[in-house]
Each structure stands twice: as structure tokens, then as C-alpha cells.
């Protein structure tokens, strides 16, 4: 029997062996930090660690999350790792609700690739607004939009697909059916903040895990940055309502978290 040749070029086999653990690969990535306005090492926080564990274990994942906790960034790093480690011309899709959103997520792919040390930046055969393709294996990251022409994904086969802000898709049922047909047994990740009660996304969450979707739930109060210095003691600030007091006790929240919550609701 012929031995299958590894087509990944220029990367020593011991490095590829090390990179079988995506956390080792992530150590070489950098991400843009809004606070410092600079690229910083990509270090996983607790929610991202939990999500990565789920990505490595499950094939159908639905994520229920608060905003700005880094889930989409983690999935983009994970997809770059999948493409990087593949020795075949696999296609990994990012599908978002608008062209601007899809382009932004694809720009994260490019930023991650360009942040790699030069010896790890394998030659690209294509780098465009929608596609990043490795020249040696043909593995690629490609972006699509859910608001474009109906069935735009039908012409493509996917090894994996990331559906970002799925709750805001104009036709969740049709697009998910297309993606599942295109991906076959490949991995599908639904990642979004909630939008409407009773939509397909809501149904998938309520049906998990019996519907073969693994739910990753990341509530806002578990994210360390979602807190503020409490202002409840100020003379002009209304005290916490009975509902707020109950919520704080039920979920073991701090006054700082409750003040953050109130400020978000009022804004």
C-alpha cells in the first residue's frame, strides 16, 4: 500500500506534531486589542477555553452568548488552525448575516495568518476579500453572506462552516438546510446573540442535546469585564428594585454587575 504524502510544505514534521494541539498553534497568533490599539498575543480567557474544548469534541455546536466575549474570534482562530493542519484541499466557510459582517470576520482570518511568524506563513495561492487559500494544500477559508442571493452556498462543499449571528439571518431554515447539505458530516458551528423568541435558533437551543446539537451557553454575568463601579448609593440614583434584588440573589451577582446591567438597559 502506498504511503500518503503529506503535502504541507516547509513546516517541519515535529512542528506539525506539536500543532495537533490547537493551543500550541494559538501561541503564535496575535489579535488586535481595542484598549491598547495594538496587536497582542492571543490568550484565551475562560469562555474561549470552554468553547475550544467543545469544538474539539462535538460536530454540531450552537452557542448562546453575550456580546463581545470573543467567541467569534476563537472560532476564526480554530478554523485557521483546521485549514493549516489539513493536508487536503478542504474548505472552511464563514457565513454571516451581512457582507460587512462576513468581511470583518474574514479580515480576522487574514490578521491571524499575517501575525504568524514568517516561517509559518505558508505561501498563499489566493488572498482576496472573500478567500484565503494555502498554496501547497489548497485548504481555504472562504466567506459568504446570508443576505445575498438565495442558495448562494449550494454550489460549494464545506469541510466545516461557521454561522455567525445566525439569529439575525433572514431565512434561518433555508440557509441551515443548505449548509448541512454542503457540509455533510463536517463540523457546523452556530454562534450568535439571541434575537427573536420562537425562531429556529431558539428551537435548536431548546432541543439540545437530543437534537444532536451541543449547546455552549455563556451568560453575560460570567464574563469578567461586564461590571462597573456601583452607583446605587448615590443620592439621585434609584435603589435596586425587588426584581433586581431577586436577580442578584438568584445568580449570586455583585452590585457592580447589577449596575452594569442597569446601565446597559438604560442605554
Residue ranges and their predicted role:
Residues 2-267:
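Phosphate/NTP-binding elements of NTP-utilizing enzymes
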Amino acid at each position: 500500500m502506498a504511503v500518503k504524502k503529506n503535502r504541507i510544505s516547509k513546516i517541519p514534521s515535529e512542528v506539525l506534531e506539536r500543532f495537533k494541539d490547537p493551543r500550541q498553534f494559538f501561541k503564535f497568533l496575535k489579535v488586535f486589542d481595542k484598549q491598547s490599539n495594538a496587536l497582542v498575543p492571543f490568550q484565551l480567557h475562560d469562555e474561549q477555553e470552554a468553547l475550544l474544548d467543545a469544538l474539539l469534541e462535538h460536530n454540531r455546536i450552537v452557542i448562546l452568548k453575550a456580546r463581545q466575549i470573543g467567541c467569534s474570534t476563537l472560532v476564526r482562530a480554530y478554523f485557521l488552525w483546521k485549514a493549516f493542519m489539513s493536508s487536503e484541499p478542504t474548505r472552511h466557510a464563514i457565513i454571516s448575516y451581512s457582507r460587512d459582517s462576513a468581511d470583518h470576520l474574514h479580515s480576522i482570518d487574514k490578521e491571524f495568518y499575517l501575525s504568524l511568524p514568517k516561517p509559518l506563513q505558508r505561501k498563499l495561492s489566493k488572498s482576496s476579500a472573500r478567500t484565503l487559500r494555502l498554496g501547497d494544500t489548497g485548504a481555504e477559508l472562504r466567506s459568504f453572506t446570508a443576505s445575498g442571493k438565495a442558495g448562494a452556498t449550494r454550489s460549494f462543499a464545506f469541510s466545516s462552516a461557521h454561522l455567525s449571528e445566525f439569529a439575525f439571518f433572514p431565512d434561518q431554515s433555508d440557509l441551515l438546510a443548505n449548509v448541512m447539505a454542503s457540509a455533510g458530516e463536517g463540523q457546523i458551528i452556530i454562534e450568535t446573540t439571541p434575537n427573536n423568541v420562537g425562531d429556529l435558533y431558539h428551537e435548536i437551543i431548546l432541543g439540545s442535546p437530543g437534537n444532536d446539537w451541543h449547546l455552549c451557553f455563556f451568560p453575560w454575568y460570567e464574563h469578567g469585564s461586564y461590571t462597573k463601579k456601583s452607583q446605587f448609593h448615590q443620592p439621585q440614583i434609584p435603589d435596586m428594585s425587588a426584581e433586581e434584588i431577586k436577580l442578584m440573589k438568584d445568580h449570586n451577582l455583585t452590585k457592580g454587575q447589577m449596575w452594569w446591567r442597569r446601565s446597559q438597559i438604560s442605554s
